[in-house]
Each structure stands twice: as structure tokens, then as C-alpha cells.
Regions:
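Alpha-helical structural elements of signaling/regulatory helical domains
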Residues: 18-21, 254, 300, 314
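C-terminal capping region of solenoid repeat domains
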Residues: 273, 291-296, 306-358, 366-371, ...
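Concave beta-strand-loop units of leucine-rich repeat
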Residues: 101-106, 116, 141-147, 166-172, ...
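N-terminal adaptor-interaction module of cullin-RING ubiquitin ligase components
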Residues: 1-166, 170-190, 194-216, 220-221, ...
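Amphipathic alpha-helical interface elements that mediate macromolecular binding in regulatory proteins
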Residues: 6, 10, 31, 35, ...
Length: 491
């Protein structure tokens, strides 16, 4: 590695840009590695898993860029700044930076003072400094912002290159109008709706974008609603961008008529994550996405999912169920809809790699599941929800479900399979699990995730460790329901 030239090292470290632990370790290898890693780390220094209010050195680095006059003024106001150091910084850190995270900046400035007014002054000086020192601004998370940073003299030149904006609706509309004036090349726009209002300013920002590719909207508030068609302006603005948007994520609390007209027009979508609850079966037939690759939908919408999948273009690689709550006993037509869903997947999505399935443990469903495994040979990850529609299924039934499931996986699992997640009404006896792991020998190393606490018992832990040591399984973890649904494995 030490003999690799700088260009190759840069490409390697670029792949680690989201892995702060590895990048920080690389800093310590030698000067060459350090010189390559620092610009990567400082491109977006606020995105790493750091308790910023404890990191006084980061505060000190930024303060060191302030002029003596500004430092003196801030000190007179009551801010506690680091002692002046005449040692020259090894790097011009801010010249590498291309991002601002308002929440993190607020956390950092709390080091200088506990008083809100003094923190505001510090933040103002930091933002002014960033506008002068940053070569460009690519990423801005301005949730709960209090500073009109786009009115600094240099702001226009920095904001012209803004690529990603994360915001929320607690922000005064004037901020969105200000951004719309200078930011017209945003590719990714993420909005958290925490304050129902008239969304004219956000709609204006959407309308002026020339190449918006990714849009995300998430409602994060309770009742009451703001009207009968609260998202109309947002959806009509998005309608003007159907030729550029290919990633769409919408979580609306309220249903409206406009979405029925607008959503079918996004004919270039590659990612679709939304709720189809308000649409009838006839309406859903007009939702045709031939380029769709990633599709996420709620557990309860099996029929809608089947229709979307059937009308897709066969390019789907990820089909995933999302939910913030657990399944209950009120899933209508569960047996029929789950069987049809499995069939639609293996008929229409032969290239699928990441797949969620929910079905009852009947012989017919197990047969359909096995057909799917034999056809979908690209599968890397399976999320299996075996659900019996019973309050407390007998343990005997849970073990029978588990034994049948493991037999099917041994017989028919594709060779690419690296990860399996199990939820609900399935449990593995010690004997069945050992037989499965023994027969898995010689296949790709496997990660398993489940939420049943039985696997924390001593005899199971001993068995799992045995097959970990033998290289049969990479991981076998028992987690909470939400972790099983949401946690990311590196497969």
C-alpha cells in the first residue's frame, strides 16, 4: 500500500468517505496518507458520528480563521474563545469544505458561550467566514436555521453550485424565496414537514430548479390538517419536474386528490417510496414505472404493490416493506394478496437483489416462495415475515414453520444470498438450526438477523459461535423489531 501513488490512494480513500473510523485511522499512517485523507474528511466534516459540543479542537480551528478584530469583539461580548496560537495550521482546512450543517454549527458554537445571543453572534461570524473561505457549497442542512446566510456578499457564488438541500417547514418562507433567487441547480431536495402551512415558498423553490433528480417529503407532525388538499402546491410544482426526477420519496399524513393525478406522470422514476393507500385498484393500473429499480411500500399494501410490480419494466432490484409499527390482526385478504405478491415478484422481477416478503406459513405459500428462490437467482438479501394472524401461536407451530423454511432455503436458495432476516411466527430448534448451518457449509458466508430472544440462550450462543469460527456465518444477531427492519448489514 505504501508504494501506491497518490491518485490510486485517493480513489481508495474516496470509497471510505462514509467510514469515519477507517479514515481517521488512515491519518496516522504517514504524511502522504494524511495529505490525501484530510481534504476528504473536511469536504463534509459535520457528517461523522462525533459529539461536536465536546470537540473543542474543531471550534478552535474555525475560530483561528477569524480576524483579530472579530475575535476581540466577540470576547468583549462575553464569548470564550481559545487562546491565540501563533502556530500555523498544517492545512487550510476550510478551503476543502463544501457543506454546512446548521444543527452541528449550533452545537459547536455552544462551546464558546452558554448565552443564546453570544452563540448567535458566533454563528453569524462562522457563516460569514464560510462564505469567504469555501470554494463552493454543495451540501446544506438548514433545518431550524436562524441566519439569512444567502445575503452575505459572497453567498451568490457559493450557493450557485448547491447540490443537496435538507430543510424543514419551521423555517420562515423568506428563506426559501431567498434560496430560489440564487439556487437553481439543486439535485437533491429533502423536506421534513414539521409545521403545516401554505407551502408556496417551497413550491417556488422547486419550480426554479433546472435538474432536480431526488425529492423527499416526510410529514412529522400531528393533527389537525391544514385543508382538504394540503399538498396541492407541492405536487403541482413537482409535476413540472417529471422529466428530471427519478427518485421520489413521499410520506404524507393526509391524502389528497392532486396526488392521484400527479404521481402516474413520473414515468422516469428509478426509486419510489410512498403510500398507495388512497388509490383504488383501477387508479393504480395507471401507475406505470418502466425504469423502476427501488420500490418501498408499507406492509399493508400488498395488493397495490403487486399492481405496481406487474406494471414495472423488469428492472426492479430492491423491493422492501417499510413500517414504523408492527403488524396486527387486521390485514384484509392477507392470504390471497400475499400469494399473488410472491407470484408477481418472480414473474416480473427476475433481477431482484433485495427483497421483503410477508406471508402465512401455508403449504401453498411455501411452494410459491420456493419457486421464487429458484427463479430470482440474483437475490442477495431476504427479509422474511412469516405471519399467522394469531395472537399467541403455539411454540410447536413456530418450530414447524422454522424447520420448513430452513429446508426450503437449503434446497433452493440462490448462490448469491448473503443475508436473511426473520420476523414473527418462525423459530428454529437447536437441531434444525445446526443442520441448516452444516448444510450451508461451502456457500457464501451468511448474516442472519432476528428479533426472537431465544437465540441469546447459552446453547444457541455456543452453536452460533461455532459456525462463526468455522466461517459459515458472518453474523447472527437478535435485535429489536425496528432494528431488524432498518439496520444496515454490509453484505
Amino acid at each position: 500500500m505504501s508504494k501506491l501513488n497518490k491518485d490510486i490512494l485517493f480513489l481508495i480513500f474516496e470509497e471510505l468517505q462514509d467510514d469515519s473510523k477507517s479514515l481517521f485511522s488512515c491519518l496516522m499512517v504517514n504524511r502522504t496518507w494524511c495529505e490525501i485523507v484530510i481534504p476528504i474528511l473536511w469536504r463534509n466534516p459535520w457528517c461523522y458520528d462525533i459529539k461536536y459540543y465536546n470537540k473543542s479542537y474543531l471550534f478552535a480551528i474555525i475560530v483561528s480563521y477569524l480576524s483579530d478584530d472579530i475575535k476581540e469583539s466577540l470576547t468583549k461580548q462575553g464569548s470564550q474563545l481559545p487562546l491565540v496560537s501563533y502556530q500555523v495550521l498544517l492545512f487550510d482546512y476550510l478551503s476543502f469544505c463544501r457543506s454546512i450543517n446548521v444543527k452541528t454549527i449550533r452545537s459547536i458554537t455552544s462551546i464558546g458561550s452558554y448565552m443564546t445571543y453570544n452563540q448567535f453572534l458566533l454563528q453569524q461570524e462562522f457563516y460569514s467566514l464560510f462564505m469567504k473561505k469555501f470554494p463552493e457549497l454543495k451540501y446544506l442542512n438548514m433545518k431550524s436555521i436562524k441566519h439569512q446566510i444567502f445575503y452575505f456578499p459572497e453567498a451568490k457564488f457559493r450557493f450557485e453550485s448547491l447540490y443537496e438541500l435538507v430543510c424543514d417547514t419551521s423555517i420562515d418562507p423568506s428563506y426559501f424565496y431567498g434560496l430560489a433567487w440564487i439556487c437553481q441547480h439543486i439535485h437533491r431536495l429533502i423536506v421534513v414537514n414539521v409545521n403545516p402551512q401554505v407551502y408556496h415558498a417551497i413550491a417556488k423553490l422547486i419550480k426554479v430548479q433546472k435538474n432536480l433528480k431526488y425529492f423527499e417529503w416526510e410529514d412529522d407532525y400531528g393533527l389537525p390538517t391544514t385543508g382538504s388538499d394540503p399538498y396541492k402546491e407541492i405536487l403541482l410544482a413537482l409535476e413540472k419536474k417529471v422529466d428530471t426526477i427519478n427518485h421520489l420519496k413521499l410520506f404524507f399524513i393526509y391524502k389528497d386528490r392532486t396526488s392521484q393525478k400527479v404521481l402516474p406522470k413520473f414515468h422516469k422514476l428509478k426509486t419510489l417510496i410512498t403510500d398507495f393507500g388512497p388509490f383504488s385498484e383501477e387508479q393504480l393500473k395507471f401507475f406505470i414505472y418502466r425504469d423502476l429499480e427501488i420500490f418501498e411500500i408499507d406492509y399493508y399494501e400488498l395488493k397495490a404493490a403487486s399492481i405496481i410490480i406487474e406494471n414495472s419494466g423488469g428492472k426492479l432490484k430492491k423491493i422492501f416493506f417499510v413500517s414504523s409499527y408492527e403488524l396486527d390482526d387486521y390485514i384484509n385478504n392477507f392470504d390471497d394478496d400475499s400469494r399473488i405478491f410472491i407470484r408477481r415478484v418472480y414473474e416480473s422481477c427476475p433481477l431482484v437483489e433485495y427483497l421483503s416478503l410477508v406471508f402465512p406459513p401455508s403449504k401453498e405459500h411455501f411452494n410459491e416462495f420456493e419457486k421464487l428462490l429458484k427463479i430470482c437467482q440474483n437475490l442477495k438479501s431476504l427479509f422474511l415475515i412469516i405471519y399467522m394472524n394469531e395472537v399467541e401461536p403455539e411454540k410447536k407451530l413456530l418450530l414447524e414453520n422454522g424447520e420448513e423454511l430452513l429446508k426450503i432455503l437449503i434446497r433452493s436458495a440462490p448462490t448469491n444470498l448473503r443475508e436473511i432476516r426473520f420476523l414473527y411466527d418462525v423459530e428454529f430448534s437447536l437441531e434444525a438450526l445446526e443442520e441448516f448451518l452444516e448444510k450451508w457449509r461451502g456457500r457464501p458466508i451468511l448474516s442472519i438477523l432476528t428479533c426472537r430472544p431465544i437465540y441469546k440462550e447459552e446453547n444457541y450462543v455456543k452453536l452460533i459461535n461455532k459456525y462463526k469460527n468455522n466461517g459459515i456465518i458472518k453474523d447472527f444477531r437478535c435485535e429489536s423489531f425496528m432494528n431488524v427492519v432498518n439496520i444496515n448489514f454490509n453484505i
